[in-house]
Amino acid sequence: MKKFDKSIAAFEEAQDLMPGGVNSPVRAFKSVGMNPLFMERGKGSKVYDIDGNEYIDYVLSWGPLIHGHANDRVVEALKSVAERGTSFGAPTEIENKLAKLVIERVPSIEIVRMVNSGTEATMSALRLARGYTGRNKILKFIGCYHGHGDSLLIKAGSGVATLGLPDSPGVPEGVAKNTITVAYNDLESVKYAFEQFGDDIACVIVEPVAGNMGVVPPQPGFLEGLREVTEQNGALLIFDEVMTGFRVAYNCGQGYYGVTPDLTCLGKVIGGGLPVGAYGGKAEIMRQIAPSGPIYQAGTLSGNPLAMAAGYETLVQLTPESYVEFERKAEMLEAGLRKAAEKHGIPHHINRAGSMIGIFFTDEPVINYDAAKSSNLEFFAAYYREMVEQGVFLPPSQFEGLFLSTAHSDADIEATIAAAEIAMSKLK
């Protein structure tokens, strides 16, 4: 049995210092029935907690670390920038370099604005969509999480789903009434919503792959249908690619599925592990943002040199060939997990999109939030705790997916499959 004495003591102290002892709810490990692991360091595909335990890491800081921990080029870039100054309140050339890469690789983006988080990106994109169209309502999908902005914290997934809170206290009714929610992958419900409210819907916001109800890919024709219905009704289509951006494909989720939105929100990977976000799209729309237009958005640390340098060094290391290798590794892990579950007769459903993998402990195909909620959460919690004992660090929520990095080796994946085999043999 692993010992967690130092993590337990650190969490006891933290609970007197921060709400729930953490700075983001899912880190409290509540849904898996254990104390959170306090991490000390990471290198490549491995992380090490303060008790000295080693883990193969599939959290990767919730997705950003696509090259694993402490990537040499990213670390050197950060050292170089820090020695010259961390922020100036004035433009720097590294902002141009990262912006050029983003514009070059993301089909929908002609102009991009850097911000400090994915939440900030989605909030800003909604304001832009409303300002550009002159409409008030937005349409989102049940179980899709787009950050903690009031307009979007309606029937959200991820941490909200994990805690069993469909909405959050503090979101005014006046805000909530302008958010229309329908089931993910249900195009007919989208069409019906436009029949009812079409003249007042500014935008549809969607994750190309729903990543905060587990990993739930779009059904064939779903994204194409959203593109068609928004164009027909004069609404904007926003892809929230904070999670899928540069994760599922070289050209992001929109390149992977061949559907181009009007606006795209980015985060995670483009910061290389530092706080960052971005939103971009058609020049005609983006030029409405101040100072070139009347729609205001600003940020003290937006485009700061540290985040821009980490993001740039992260993206330049990603090539089309990187994603061929991601596909091979992800297929290997998916097949191994499926084989282990089948061997022990454990009800399961596995979804995957590129290097994102979700395993649900249910017999039901998972195509939306209701299906995801059919998972056996008690079994997941027991499986999670056993995987920790076996030295594998997974996201501590049934409603989050696993992430792979360029640092994960075949040996890591084989060890993970072996750990899952042991865990499932004990729990069947």
From Swiss-Prot:
PROSITE patterns found in the cross-reference section: AA_TRANSFER_CLASS_3
Pathway info: Porphyrin-containing compound metabolism; protoporphyrin-IX biosynthesis; 5-aminolevulinate from L-glutamyl-tRNA(Glu): step 2/2
GO annotation, cellular component aspect: cytoplasm
Biological process terms in GO annotation: protoporphyrinogen IX biosynthetic process
Modified residue annotations for N6-(pyridoxal phosphate)lysine: K268
Similarity annotation: Belongs to the class-III pyridoxal-phosphate-dependent aminotransferase family. HemL subfamily.
Entry protein name: Glutamate-1-semialdehyde 2,1-aminomutase 1
Species: Bacillus cereus (strain G9842)
Lineage of the species this protein comes from: Bacteria, Bacillati, Bacillota, Bacilli, Bacillales
Gene: hemL1
